[in-house]
Regions:
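N-terminal leader/targeting segments and the immediately adjacent pre-domain N-terminus
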Residues: 1-43, 98-99, 103-105, 140-145, ...
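Catalytic-site signature segments of enzymes, centered on catalytic residues
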Residues: 44-45, 109-112, 120-206
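Active-site SXXK
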Residues: 31, 49-73, 97, 167-171, ...
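Active-site Gly/Thr loop motif
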Residues: 194-197, 248-303
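A short acidic/small-residue loop/turn micro-motif
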Residues: 39-43, 47, 310-313
């Protein structure tokens, strides 16, 4: 396969893999592995940090629990976490948290070492240089420190990882169970996974739900295949089909909010819903900083997992070329 990159140059598949700092690349076609390669000392058993692909697991878990009647996604998060009443989350619903359309002011600019994202990451030990005696000690303490709002609820789409942390709090309060145990019971075990997954937690055991999961490449492919199959895996319905359909289709409001955002140019027909990226009606993605992606192409029956180690968290050229690579491969095999 020859691929035209974002700069207009033609590259071979092999060169594109190398230039986008790939650690592993796996292609499923109709549920079968047709390509699998590992780089940089990775192997099929290796766990890799998936960053914000973690969010997509959380989104699917919310769909499962909502279907079981644990909560209604129209409900405010403060019903379950009343401590948040006096914060920027006071009017946030489970749905607006899922869709990154909530009101809370939160800066997520990975190139700014003092932004809110890195301050939250510091709570779980990712940025020890940002920790001092006055720093929040738990993820809940951090959320309670966010008092301001940057918009009205559902006014616009703005990607903020802390909203996924709040979803984790809601899940734990509504179920009286740990998020990691629920992920294991409702998703991980049902995918017949090869390896255990690992998730980063704060001192209370609450997971860093927006970024903290680690898993092997093949197990992420299983997750992608389940989404491709409308929520089923090996004939078992894991996530309600209606949840997958609703996520994929969105509506004009979702697309308008996305088009006006910083991410709009990336996917002109796209939207973001239920912690999933949707490029168009056929292609869905789970995406994490430093180049982590699950690409799901409904039209061609392909799932591609690409783990990467970009030099910078959100390099627009590298992400653009990665998305071109994934779309080209998924439409060619």
């Amino acid at each position: 396969i020859e691929i035209q990159n974002i700069e207009g140059q033609t590259q071979s598949f092999k060169d594109m893999i190398a230039s986008t700092h790939t650690d592993s690349f796996l292609v499923l076609k109709n549920g079968e592995i047709i390509f699998e390669e590992y780089f940089n000392e990775m192997n099929p058993e290796s766990l890799h940090l998936m960053n914000s692909i973690t969010k997509s697991f959380m989104g699917m878990l919310v769909g499962i629990l909502a279907d079981k009647g644990v909560f209604d996604i129209k409900e405010k998060v403060t019903k379950y976490v009343p401590e948040l009443n006096d914060t920027g989350f006071s009017e946030t619903t489970i749905q607006s948290a899922l869709d990154m359309s909530a009101a809370v002011k939160f800066e997520e600019d990975y190139d700014q070492p003092l932004c809110d994202f890195w301050k939250e990451a510091a709570v779980v030990g990712w940025r020890p240089d940002l920790v001092d005696d006055n720093s929040p000690k738990t993820l809940l303490d951090f959320a309670l420190s966010l008092k301001e709002k940057e918009q009205e609820e559902i006014e616009g789409y703005h990607y903020r990882s802390v909203l996924t942390t709040v979803l984790a709090m809601v899940i734990e309060r509504a179920t009286d169970e740990r998020v990691q145990d629920l992920l294991e019971k409702h998703i991980w075990q049902k995918l017949k996974t090869e390896q255990d997954a690992v998730i980063v937690v704060d001192k209370t055991g609450l997971p860093f739900a927006g970024a903290g999961m680690n898993a092997c490449t093949r197990d992420l492919a299983r997750f992608g295949q389940m989404i491709l199959n409308d929520g089923t895996y090996e004939r078992e319905q894991i996530v309600p089909k209606e949840w997958i359909d609703s996520t994929r289709m969105g509506d004009d409001g979702y697309r308008e909010r996305f088009a006006k955002s910083d991410h709009g140019a990336m996917f002109p027909e796209g939207h973001y819903k239920n912690q999933m990226w949707v490029a168009n009606s056929e292609e869905m993605m789970c995406v994490g900083i430093y180049g982590q992606t699950i690409h799901i192409n409904k039209n061609t029956g392909t799932v591609i997992v690409k783990f990467s180690s970009f030099p910078e968290p959100a390099d627009e050229i590298l992400f653009a070329n990665s998305f071109i690579l994934l779309a080209t491969v998924s439409n060619s095999v």
